[in-house]
Amino acid sequence: MQKNQTIFLNTWKFLITLHQKPWSTFFTKIPDFPHVLLKDIAKVGVGLVSGFDEAFLLNEDDISKLNEDEKQLIKNFVKAKNCKRFVVEGFVQYILIEDNLKDEEIFKTKYPNIYKKLLKFKDRMENRYLPKNKKWFNWQALRNYKFLIKNLNKKRIYVPTLDRKPYNRFSLGDDELLPSGDVIFIQPYNDDDIYFLLGYLNSSFFRNYYLANGGRRGGRVAFTQKLLENAKIPTFSDEVKEKIKNIVKDIIYNLKNGKDIENLERQIDYIIVSAINNNQFKGYQTTLKNLLKPKLKG
């Protein structure tokens, strides 16, 4: 047996253990590997914060009362509870009032039913922390809003900002979705990277790398913009990335059809560790400039 095969088999035994001990930081001393930072190949950002979800949340009865102008303010949001690991299930609907709406009389006239709904919460909404240029009916923080709207037709990866689950819940959402304040979004600059990233970020390898690099918050894992932006993403060969991509597609298919995915997840871990031990990386002739293309709008 070759030396690198011995290293791999020993590491594979540890991977089996890590499935049973998901809070382990075994990889604290893992040797460095050829990589790019996640921020070099994807936009990583925080979600939109209303500051008072109860007021902006819509149910079917609310929606039935809205006029056509008011329906244009309805947006579909991904919350932490919708992140099921690999896939987003469902969404919640909120009234989203953009910051350029400042005149309360215009608001009241053009959106009477929404105005009436929000008016019930006015006193409490005024007690939110709001920048001086915002009105009581505005959202608290529309961070990354222009970027998100410009790229609303693209799929994104979402992950809860805080999680007690013993596994990562990076989840792929369809287009026309926005991130709420309790999730982080990841938008690859190259659409082809989305399935590879989804597989890698949900792997046991990445979970333990992330925990070892500051992601632990007591009994929870904290996925922050800063930590994720600076996470190392291996520059695997195209062959390795394609294998992971295809397995992730199989995982999503199985999840949508009520089938088990455990063996497929273990295959991803196997491929990642094997690729690192056997130096299956792209040549260094690939420049960062090329990795950053094509850039998204915004």
Swiss-Prot record:
Stated EC number for the protein is: 2.1.1.72
| Coiled-coil portions | none
Keyword Nucleotidyltransferase assigned: no
Q: Does the keyword Protein biosynthesis apply?
A: no
Q: Could you state a single Gene Ontology molecular function term?
A: DNA binding
Which GO terms of type biological process are on file? DNA restriction-modification system; methylation
- Keyword annotations from UniProtKB, A to Z: DNA-binding, Methyltransferase, Restriction system, Transferase
Query: For this UniProt entry, which residues form the secretion signal?
Result: none
- Reactions accelerated catalytically: a 2'-deoxyadenosine in DNA + S-adenosyl-L-methionine = an N(6)-methyl-2'-deoxyadenosine in DNA + S-adenosyl-L-homocysteine + H(+)
PANTHER family, per the entry: DNA METHYLTRANSFERASE YEEA-RELATED (PTHR33841), TYPE II METHYLTRANSFERASE M.HINDII (PTHR33841:SF6)
Q: Under which name does UniProt file this protein?
A: Type II methyltransferase M.MjaIV
Gene name for this UniProt entry: mjaIVMP
